[in-house]
């Protein structure tokens, strides 16, 4: 029997973590985007082997010497606040950040870093959470209202961790 009456666990505050500390904490668990890799559904091409190397601290043989891959993959982090602000402006909902890692209380190896939560202005409790994304206008995984499968897996993982039933995705399409 599945227990659906649980309170999500705040695993650790990330407010004062460096990027390196945050990355090290992520290595100790399986997150939403990791789950998509494990299922073979990552549209960025990350492999299970790369995930294994990352989780075990093994450096890749081929490095990203010029940092191009890092810039592309981290652009979402750089633009996350702007995406959340646009979401709030367009919906009238308040997007707010809780700088923490959340852990599933029944499966402590599953953790999530939630981009934002959202609520009605003037209210205290969240309605759900917001996943902030950025992509190229040429990304064929986004067609119409279809959300890329790996994002669906990521969001499903977070819904389970948080014991919530609502999530919104806000995506900024960047021209190339």
For each feature predicted by the language model, list its residue ranges.
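Charged, glycine-rich intrinsically disordered N-terminal tails and low-complexity linkers that flank
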Residues: 1-78
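Generic structural marker for isolated residues within well-ordered, non-membrane alpha-helices
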Residues: 49, 84, 155
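Nucleic-acid nuclease catalytic cores
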Residues: 73, 89-114, 118-176
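Basic, amphipathic N-terminal segments that precede the first structured/catalytic domain
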Residues: 79-90
């Amino acid at each position: 029997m599945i227990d659906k009456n649980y309170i999500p666990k705040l695993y650790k505050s990330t407010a004062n973590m460096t990027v390196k500390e945050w990355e090290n904490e992520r290595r100790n668990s399986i997150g939403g985007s990791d789950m998509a890799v494990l299922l073979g559904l990552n549209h960025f091409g990350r492999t299970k082997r790369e995930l294994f190397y990352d989780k075990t601290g093994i450096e890749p043989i081929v490095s990203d010497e010029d940092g191009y891959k890092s810039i592309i993959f981290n652009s979402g982090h750089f633009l996350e606040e702007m995406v959340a602000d646009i979401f709030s402006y367009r919906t009238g909902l308040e997007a707010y950040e809780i700088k923490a890692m959340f852990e599933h209380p029944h499966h402590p190896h599953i953790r999530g870093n939630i981009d934002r939560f959202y609520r009605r202005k003037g209210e205290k409790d969240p309605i759900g959470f917001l996943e902030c994304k950025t992509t190229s206008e040429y990304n064929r995984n986004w067609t119409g209202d279809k959300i890329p499968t790996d994002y669906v897996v990521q969001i499903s993982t977070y819904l389970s961790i948080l014991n919530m039933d609502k999530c919104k995705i806000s995506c900024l399409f960047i021209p190339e």
